[in-house]
Amino acid sequence: WLKAFPEAKIPQTEADIKSKNRTPTVLYNGMLHPLIGMTMKGVIWYQGEDNWNRAHTYADMFTRLINGWRAEWKQGDFPFYYCQIAPYDYGIITEKGKEVINSAYLREAQAKVEHRVANSGMAVLLDAGMEKGIHPAKKQVAGERLALLALTKTYGVEGVNGESPYYKSIEIKNDTVVVSFERANMWISGKNCFESKNFQVAGEDKVFYPAKAWIERSNCLLYTSDAADE
């Protein structure tokens, strides 16, 4: 399936190999293919950093990877749970502009896969990264959230919230933006409202300012900022 992605080139000679462990097909043939045929309950996948600048092809490539593994095993659509790439300042390792190195584009592509591929799920790690550390230390957080996905979606454990809220829509009312989410019933209490300081808002000038935010009802975030332009 790599033929559909010309940038994933397989070196023709050993001299063309810059990094052997990153050569397309090497990890698959060396570590995965020998396991084909064994009983498969499901997969948990920790996304590495090497794809941070491939957001434009990531959703298609990752979808094909999952479908390809399932086809090889011939054991149906077994669960495939994966980690969102954690935040990191990629400006440390490249001189490209923020429009290119913004890993938010990759996280957006990862979110698309969850909605394209049946029986899959993404563990959100937006709060578990390190600005100056490309390998974040909070691996336990990743493990716990993958486990919650499995408990919720595979083992049917009740009372466990394994899925993160997913953006649905926005509505602008004067100086207030109402952001609605799917899958937020267990994330937000319908009985109480509470304030959050984890949001920013920007106007057409794309300059972000801290926003006053409230979690309200079962699936909405309301936030405002006096500093942002319309």
Segments the model singles out, each with a brief description of its role:
Residues S103-L106, G162, I215:
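Mature catalytic domains of secreted/periplasmic carbohydrate-active enzymes
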Residues Y223-E230:
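Conserved small/polar residues in nucleotide/adenosyl-binding loops
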Residues S218-L221:
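Aromatic sugar-binding surface patches on proteins
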